Amino acid sequence: MSNDSFFNNDWLELQRKYWDSWSEMGRKAMGLENQQTLTTPWEGALDHWWKAMSPATPDFSKTFMEKMMEQGKNFFRMAETFANTPEDTTATNGLTWWTKALEDMQKQFSGSLDDGGNSMQRMMSFWELPIDNWQRMMSSMSPMPGDMLRNMPHEQLKDRSGRALSAPGLGYTREEQSQYHQLTRTAMDYQAALQEYTGFYSQLGMKSVERMGDFIQGVIDSGKSIDSARTLYDNWISCCETVYAAEVATPEYAQIHGRLVNAQMALKRRMAIMVDENLGAMNMPTRSELRTLQDRLQETRRDNKQLHRALHALEKQVAALSGKTPTTALKAPAPATKATEKPATRATTRRKTAAKPTGGTADD
């Protein structure tokens, strides 16, 4: 009889492979098979801490904390990258190593390295917030959930759909087909403007790397040294902020941002028209009808105020003709009040008349 228990090492190894296979299948289903692995112990510890604390984090602050965690991971990743110095620590090889590290960062910004397409998202964490805010705003104003145009291949779609959009509509739904064609053209224009806007931020990343290279070259030429990873990270942040402040103030950024806003408003207007068409087909009140009703109610309020002012002016004129002030004219008793005073006088007379016989009887 074998002395091995049922839960031997082979069984545990089989269970581990089973769960690893399920985890790998889940990552592939979610598109996370090429996600970057955690290379540093501090980065792994920070990730485990956030996974334990994130379920209890409120929704309104979870996004902010995720950005902070990503900044911390970038800090540890950069510290690990620059801490792995070459074996030959001469000045020439050291400068070559620093130059190669900066060139790799530029390649990551340009997307030339095979990193699953996530290098740009990680390296753009410093400028990801404005783009993320814009995408959230666009998603909230769109009748369709999510950002449907985020991963759309613009050039391929533009080339293939150009012929289809140029074809006229057929049948009794040709007007509706024409509206959908216009909606598609507007969406493609917005996608082109969004890609131009994102490309501008990619150029910011490359210029920041160049500025960081100039800073490191200046440190090497001066004979100084960088004492800690925190100093290196602070200088990197300073380079990014300087480049951002300089480039955002240029007319080029104003034109790019203006084209993006115009394309977004045109797309929003076209979507609103399509929504009104669908609501009208279902015999439901549309947005334009509700807005027309609101305008008419506002006009009615204005007319009532004008009539009230005109009536008050007429009351003043009547009071001036009758020789009374407007206040007394408004508070003057109506003619029906005099009629009500007469019964009171009669009642007093009757009381006096009724009191006289009583007194005569007492004298008798």
Swiss-Prot record:
Choose one Gene Ontology CC annotation of this protein and give it: cytoplasm
Keywords, comma-separated and alphabetical: Cytoplasm, PHB biosynthesis
Q: Where is this region: Disordered?
A: 322-364
Q: Where is the signal peptide?
A: none
> Which InterPro entries does the entry link to?
PHA_synth_III_E (IPR010123)
Coiled-coil regions listed: none
Pathway involvement of the protein, from the record: Biopolymer metabolism; poly-(R)-3-hydroxybutanoate biosynthesis
Q: Could you tell me where this protein is found in the cell?
A: Cytoplasm
Biased amino acid composition, Low complexity: 324-338
Which is one Pfam family of this protein? PHA_synth_III_E
GO BP, sorted A to Z: poly-hydroxybutyrate biosynthetic process
Q: Self-association or partners: how does it assemble? A: Forms a heterodimer with PhaC, which may multimerize in the presence of 3-hydroxybutyryl-CoA.
Extra remark beyond the main annotation = Poly(3-hydroxyalkanoic acids) (PHA), of which PHB is among the most common compounds, has potential uses as a renewable, biodegradable thermoplastic. PHB serves as an intracellular energy reserve material when cells grow under conditions of nutrient limitation.
Q: What does this protein do?
A: Polymerizes D(-)-3-hydroxybutyryl-CoA to create polyhydroxybutyrate (PHB) which consists of thousands of hydroxybutyrate molecules linked end to end. This subunit has no catalytic activity but enhances the activity of PhaC, the catalytic subunit.
Q: Which NCBIfam families match?
A: PHA_synth_III_E (TIGR01834)
* Family according to the record: Belongs to the PHA/PHB synthase family. Type III PhaE subfamily.
The name this protein carries in UniProt is Poly(3-hydroxyalkanoate) polymerase subunit PhaE
- Which gene carries the instructions for this protein? phaE
